Design a protein with these regions (language model features):
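Hydrophobic alpha-helical connector segments
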Residues: 58, 62, 72-98, 152-155
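Amphipathic alpha-helical segments used for helix-helix packing
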Residues: 91-115, 162-165
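Helix-turn-helix
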Residues: 12, 20-54, 58
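N-terminal intrinsically disordered/low-complexity leader segments
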Residues: 1-8
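Generic hydrophobic, amphipathic alpha-helix propensity
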Residues: 8-17, 34, 55, 59-63, ...
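Amphipathic alpha-helical packing segments from all-alpha helical-bundle domains
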Residues: 65-68, 72, 115-140, 149-153, ...
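C-terminal peripheral helix-coil segments that are non-catalytic and often amphipathic
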Residues: 94, 128-139, 157-158, 171-192
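All-alpha amphipathic helical-bundle segments outside canonical DNA-binding/catalytic cores
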Residues: 83-86, 118-124, 139-156, 174-177, ...
Length: 192
């Protein structure tokens, strides 16, 4: 019972911090802002996280791990590259619709500014997983044998740009409405 209460409070802190980081920016969000949004004392907040940076790192890690696990499941579910990568894009689009703050934090935030260990979101586990999926598809002759990073950009460049447009409020329709056209453009650039 106590474990659940602790987890709920920690999740609440992370959720409120995510909202503030995406709305105000990391540097414009103070620990006091997070504490006020969570309706808890600063001391309570520090019982869960030792700094604002540790909250940011935990958020990134949680989002990264969820996306990585989803990609692993997609890879297991689909045996054909065409279906697999289309499902990846569908997942990214649906996740953006469900949790735009999470996707904004993952893709927009310049994590290296406050997480010096991180190189780039594009070297994180999910994107390394996608690169691995590309290399396997190339080995199997299912997609063009081009530089793997170029193939990843060909597959995800357009969809990620669509995600940015949706987050920025440029696209009125939900992202899944654009899935077929977006995926066909990506597929044409890598198909054999």
């Amino acid at each position: 019972m106590k474990e659940t209460k602790i987890q709920k409070r920690q999740e609440r802190i992370l959720l409120e911090a995510l909202k503030l980081f995406t709305k105000k920016g990391y540097y414009n969000t103070s620990v006091s802002d997070i504490q006020a949004a969570c309706n808890c004392s600063v001391g309570t907040l520090y019982n869960y996280f030792n700094s604002k940076e540790s909250i940011a790192v935990t958020l990134f890690s949680n989002i990264e791990n969820c996306l990585y696990e989803a990609l692993c499941e997609i890879e297991k579910k689909y045996s054909h590259t065409y279906d697999c990568f289309k499902a990846v894009i569908r997942h990214l689009f649906e996740t953006t619709e469900r949790n735009s703050d999470g996707m904004q934090y993952l893709l927009y935030t310049k994590h290296r500014e406050f997480m010096p260990v991180e190189k780039s979101v594009f070297t994180s586990l999910p994107f390394l997983k996608i690169k691995d999926m590309v290399m396997k598809a190339q080995e199997n002759g299912e997609i063009r044998n081009i530089e793997p990073d170029v193939a990843v950009v060909a597959i995800l460049g357009g969809p990620i740009r669509m995600i940015y447009l949706r987050i920025d409020g440029v696209l009125e329709n939900p992202l899944p409405a654009y899935l077929e056209e977006c995926w066909e453009c990506s597929w044409r650039s890598i198909k054999v």
